[in-house]
Amino acid sequence: GYAIYDSVKDYYFGYYENNYETYAALTARHFNAQYHCTAKSGIGIMVSWFPMIMPEMYDRLDATDSTSKWDFSKYTPDVVVINLLQNDSWIVTMSDQPEFKHRFGTAAPTESEVIDAYKKFVQTIRDTYPKSQIICMLGNMDITKKGSPWPGYVDDAVKQLHDKKIFTFFSPYKDTYGHPKVREQKAMADGLIKFIDENIKW
């Protein structure tokens, strides 16, 4: 819910954020589903705006403590939604950004490296939840803008996994400034709800 309430500056301040009104929480409430969310504003699969990526964080109880591990046996979801890569898609073009240098050195990842990194993380989630249905989603920022290669990367990764219980869903590009606001989160939720109704058997 980064900047969900800030329609002017798109600021990161906490009082502009609210997970309760995000597409994920809205979707869970629609289905009266138990909601378990692992998220951090600015995080990516290969690179983030800070020195941690989702493959390093997803299994932590305390995101700031690498020794604090979540016990996955406590909860097994029927459906897992993975919505990542928006931050990667920006930072991989910023060779002067500190985290670019930290993760990649001087050369941006190739298309095959992006696909492999995404595929590896999805496989990790599959190994964690062997029976869950997984939706590989992209949100409605510029990652789904016409001409973006990133939906293709996700499609390729999922195809290579050969898993009939892993799906893709890409929200239509919102074509507005900044991060999704309340109305745009609702639009994402509506799309995801429709996709789940049409494709997921609970």
Q: Model features per residue range: what roles?
A:
Residues 118-123, 155:
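Generic structural signal for well-ordered alpha-helices
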Residues 129-134:
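A short helix->loop->beta-strand "cap" motif at the edges of active sites that frequently abuts
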Residues 169-174:
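Short glycine-rich catalytic loops that host catalytic nucleophiles or stabilize transition states
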Residues 114, 118, 185:
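Aromatic/hydrophobic pocket-lining residues that form the small-molecule binding cavity
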Residues 67-76, 123-128, 199-202:
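Surface-exposed acidic, glycine-flexible loop patches that form ligand/cofactor-binding
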Residues 159-164:
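Short helix-capping segments at alpha-helix termini
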Residues 2-3, 8-107, 142-148, 152, ...:
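Conserved SGNH/GDSL esterase-like catalytic core that processes O-acyl groups on lipids
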Residues 177-202:
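Histidine-centered active-site loop/cap adjacent to the catalytic His
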